[in-house]
UniProtKB/Swiss-Prot annotation:
Pfam families: RraA-like. Homotrimer. Binds to both RNA-binding sites in the C-terminal region of Rne and to RhlB. One of its GO terms (biological process) is negative regulation of RNA catabolic process. Coiled coil: none annotated. GO terms for cellular component: cytosol. Its main location: cytoplasm. The lineage of its organism: Bacteria, Pseudomonadati, Pseudomonadota, Gammaproteobacteria, Enterobacterales. This is Regulator of ribonuclease activity A. Belongs to the RraA family. It comes from the Bacteria. Keywords: Cytoplasm. It is found in: Cytoplasm. HAMAP family: RraA. It comes from Klebsiella pneumoniae subsp. pneumoniae (strain ATCC 700721 / MGH 78578).
Length: 161
């Protein structure tokens, strides 16, 4: 499904929070939406493998990487795993790498920046926790909608049809 965050903001202005415009699109899908699962990990993506191995249909993995752009939390292998398990998208408050490969994949990926250095894989981090970045507080179960214009968050799913 294609989302227009500008139109959604016009309709649901009182019901949504707008994420500050810090992010760029790196995935092959420019528009995506779904229920978020939060994860907090700093320069370590080991936990992401476990989460992305689960069925992600209708879900977005929202990753709080502390805003670090020193190491990429998402690479082509992780993104392919997400596509294989039907995730709608990945939002990374941090960096990604292998961007030429990422843009070929049918998944939405929003991140702060790209860098060639990979993350550690020790599995340090926690999931289903409250995270805050971009002027918004995110909880697992919230609904996020993204396109090239920006990202918006709602506690409940928006009536898009």
């Amino acid at each position: 499904m294609k989302y227009d965050t500008s139109e959604l903001c016009d309709i649901y202005q009182e019901d949504v929070n707008v994420v500050e415009p810090l992010f760029s699109n790196f995935g092959g899908r420019s528009s995506f939406g779904g229920q978020i699962i939060t994860v907090k990990c700093f320069e370590d993506n080991g936990l992401l493998y476990d989460l992305l191995e689960q069925n992600g249909r209708g879900h977005i993995l929202l990753i709080d990487g502390g805003g670090s752009v020193r190491r990429a939390l998402i690479d082509a292998d992780l993104a392919r795993l997400a596509v294989q398990n039907e995730w709608e998208g990945l939002v990374v408050y941090g960096a990604v790498r292998q961007v030429d490969d990422l843009e070929e994949l049918d998944i939405g990926i929003q991140a702060l920046a790209a860098i060639p250095v990979g993350a550690a894989g020790e599995g340090i981090g926690e999931s289903d926790v409250r995270v805050n970045f971009g002027g918004v507080t995110f909880f697992s179960g919230d609904h996020l909608y993204a396109d090239n214009t920006g990202m918006i968050l709602s506690e409940d799913p928006l009536d898009i049809e």
